[in-house]
């Protein structure tokens, strides 16, 4: 059982706020996770357990493989995102090791600090 001062971190996704196409199931599940986290935070507040959603942006890692989409689906995704004003070719992407410190920072917050949502994104070089 968790005690007062414990911290729950749920990892969300920028996809619920960015105009991607063809990701409706993923986007919906991440939006649901954020709503669940909000409700859980309210339920656990009196017990002193904190809940934070870390909404992550695009990241890469050398061990991560590219999506295995067929060519036509990949083209529809790219064209749909472009139509929605999202240029995937110019979007900055962070290395996964660059953002892990955010999780440590959330865990190390003083017990009197409440941080419900954090958004992590890449910046242009």
Regions found by a protein language model. Give the residues of each.
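A short helix-coil junction within the Rossmann-fold of NAD(P)-dependent oxidoreductases
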Residues: 1-5
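Residue(s) in the substrate-gating loop at a strand-loop-helix junction
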Residues: 13
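Conserved catalytic-site region of short-chain dehydrogenase/reductase
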Residues: 16-18
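Active-site loop immediately N-terminal to the catalytic Tyr-X3-Lys motif
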Residues: 20-24, 91
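Active-site helix of classical SDR
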Residues: 29
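Alpha-helical segment proximal to the catalytic Tyr-Lys
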Residues: 42-43
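Conserved SDR Rossmann-fold cofactor-binding beta-strand/turn motif
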Residues: 50-60
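C-terminal helical subdomain
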Residues: 53, 73-125
């Amino acid at each position: 059982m968790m005690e007062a001062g414990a911290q729950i971190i749920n990892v969300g996704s920028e996809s619920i706020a960015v105009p991607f196409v063809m990701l409706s199931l993923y986007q919906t599940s991440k939006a649901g996770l954020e709503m669940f986290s909000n409700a859980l935070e309210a339920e656990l507040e009196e017990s002193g357990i904190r809940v934070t959603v870390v909404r992550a942006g695009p990241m890469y890692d050398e061990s991560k493989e590219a999506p295995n989409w067929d060519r036509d689906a990949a083209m529809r995704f790219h064209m749909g995102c472009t139509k929605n004003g999202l240029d995937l070719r110019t979007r900055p992407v962070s290395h996964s090791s660059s953002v892990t410190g955010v999780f440590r920072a959330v865990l190390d917050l003083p017990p009197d600090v409440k941080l419900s949502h954090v958004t992590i994104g890449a910046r242009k070089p």
